[in-house]
Amino acid sequence: MKKTLIGFIVGVWSLSITTLAIADSIELKLATFEPPKAFIASQILAAWADKVNAESNGGLEVKVFAGGTLGGPPKQYDIVKGGVADISWTVLGYIGGQFPLSSVIELPFLTRTSAAGSKALNTLYDEGYLDKEMAGIKLIGLHSNPAYQFHMKDTQVMNPGDFKGLKMRVPSKIAGTILAKLGATGVKVPAPGTSEALRKGVLDGTPFPYTAIGSFKLQDVTKYHTEVNITNATFGLIMNEDKYNSLPDDLKKVIDNNSGHVFGDWAAGLIDAQNAKMKAEVAGLEGHVITVAPDDVIEEYKSILAPIEAEWLEEMKGKGLDGDAVLKRAREVISSVDG
């Protein structure tokens, strides 16, 4: 009887401790519009959440809400600011006008790899260039994609003149300007809807890195892939500032230890590897054609698109921002990585 009573007390005590630990765990909702099985959601965000959870020793429980369940692509910034989500992974270019200097990475032919773009973005943030546009949120980290190539449904493109009249997806403001200067008709379609838009003929093609092909099943609706390194995009893992400030110092440190260059460099390594993997897979698919634009054709693109940089610098100047300094610093960092 005595042993039974002691066993009961120990069991109740253990259950109480477990319940207390669960009660003390702080849940953080991490939102993304990417499908649950897409590369970013499953290999970057879920892995980051697992790492933070493990390092917090149960103090944090980051849960990923994928597929836009907490808000669609253009709403990711708003749901973090409004507290619907605690953290969000978002395309900064989707949020009109909020992140002007961060759009430097979108300029034509600036980057080739995620490693270079991500290093440049986090360096710009560390050195204070992006302080104004990041005010009001806790920035966990930034990264870019590898350079965007053209992925087409039925029309093979190579020269700048080949785009005239084609319906092309516009992933950002600068990409829209690029496509307009090439004579294409820009169509705004959220990334998850690209495959369906191509299938229905709403789009003839889209600029995307190879990483997006598997995530959005583009291999089923495209067959021509032309490499030009035309543009890029800036992505941010952002957190509600009040939520971050409410955390105990030890849990803030866990977030901080997985932020900035640590996050950006780690994510970029995975992204560049996935880009190479998906390109190899596409190359092995029957009926798919990959073409690399030769240097003389690239020079034609550069000649047509050259005014975009000057226009961007003028736009930054009009906003009272030092675009010249940001572009110069971005180029320095990118050159140190991409060569």
Language model features: what each stretch is:
Residues M1-F8:
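Bacterial N-terminal signal peptides that target proteins for export
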Residues I6, L20-A21:
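Serine/threonine-rich, low-complexity intrinsically disordered segments
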Residues D24-G117, Y125, K132-G339:
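N-terminal secretory/targeting leader peptides
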Residues S14-T19:
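N-terminal signal peptide c-region/cleavage motif recognized by signal peptidases
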